[in-house]
């Protein structure tokens, strides 16, 4: 049975095309305060959708995106017609973000959330050296690489795919641990981990080989330790058209040229 939503809130990226779309949709459907609306309609590209999901994770709000950007992997097709019906018939995907806890060279601590991935990368011309632990057990004593990332199924088609990591079905209870340009160990190309594990990464020779850490768009410089785990307290909820579902998009990506 289709759900019924009475109120929509339209938010748009600063791009002219997105702003114009918001004006057109408000003229047809009205507009509500995002805090009080049943559904938030995000207009823009994938970056804006990520930003919107970060804003709504602690509220449980449903987000329906329409592409007014470039790639639009996370977005639905843009149209001003039958929007209430499209949203009522949409499939819902709900997932927990990753929580990144960092300690930097000064001992300062910082926490950030990631829907796509948490990644570490070398800050200088020298390769990073990392010690990798999973649930307290050391799995790699020393990984020499340009970087390392932990991706969710939702983020597995983004940076993770560019780094030759595996694409994960959206419903898979897995995380992809993927190295970026690994040098040693020679044959290690990553691992699939259960989504309930805690991953600790210790930066070796941090003063000589500085490393930054990023959770989606939030960057912390010169870290010495990073802990990553799924945050079960927060949930991102996204709606997709049945004929262009998120799961189908991820499947199609595995057969693209």
From Swiss-Prot:
Cofactors that this protein relies on: a divalent metal cation
Pfam families listed in its UniProt record: NAD_kinase, NAD_kinase_C
GO cellular component assignments: cytoplasm
The keyword NADP appears for this protein: yes
Annotated binding of NAD(+), by residue: 46-47, 51, 116-117, 146, 154, 157-162, 218
Keywords: ATP-binding, Cytoplasm, Kinase, NAD, NADP, Nucleotide-binding, Transferase
Reaction(s) this enzyme catalyzes, per UniProt: NAD(+) + ATP = ADP + NADP(+) + H(+)
Chain's role: Involved in the regulation of the intracellular balance of NAD and NADP, and is a key enzyme in the biosynthesis of NADP. Catalyzes specifically the phosphorylation on 2'-hydroxyl of the adenosine moiety of NAD to yield NADP.
Name of the featured protein: NAD kinase
Naturally occurring in which organism (per UniProt): Rhizobium meliloti (strain 1021)
């Amino acid at each position: 049975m289709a759900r019924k939503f009475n109120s929509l809130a339209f938010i748009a990226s600063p791009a002219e095309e997105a702003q114009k779309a918001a004006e057109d949709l408000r003229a047809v459907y009205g507009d509500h305060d995002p805090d009080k609306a049943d559904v938030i309609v995000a207009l823009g590209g994938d970056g804006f959708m990520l930003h919107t999901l970060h804003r709504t994770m602690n509220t449980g709000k449903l987000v329906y995106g329409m592409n007014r950007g470039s790639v639009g992997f996370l977005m639905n097709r843009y149209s001003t017609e039958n929007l209430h019906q499209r949203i009522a018939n949409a499939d819902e995907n709900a997932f927990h973000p990753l929580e990144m806890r960092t300690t930097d060279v000064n001992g300062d601590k910082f926490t950030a959330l990631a829907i796509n991935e948490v990644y570490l990368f070398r800050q200088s011309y020298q390769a990073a050296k990392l010690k990798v632990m999973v649930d307290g057990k050391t799995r790699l004593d020393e990984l020499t690489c340009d970087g390392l990332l932990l991706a969710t199924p939702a983020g597995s088609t983004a940076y993770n795919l560019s780094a030759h990591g595996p694409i994960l079905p959206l419903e898979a209870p897995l995380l992809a641990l993927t190295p970026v340009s690994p040098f040693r160990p020679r044959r290690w190309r990553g691992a699939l981990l259960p989504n309930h594990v805690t991953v600790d990464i210790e930066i070796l020779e941090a003063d000589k080989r500085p490393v930054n850490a990023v959770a989606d768009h939030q960057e912390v410089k010169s870290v010495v330790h990073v802990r990553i785990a799924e945050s079960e307290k927060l949930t991102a909820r996204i709606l997709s058209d049945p004929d262009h579902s998120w799961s189908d998009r991820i499947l199609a990506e595995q057969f693209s040229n």
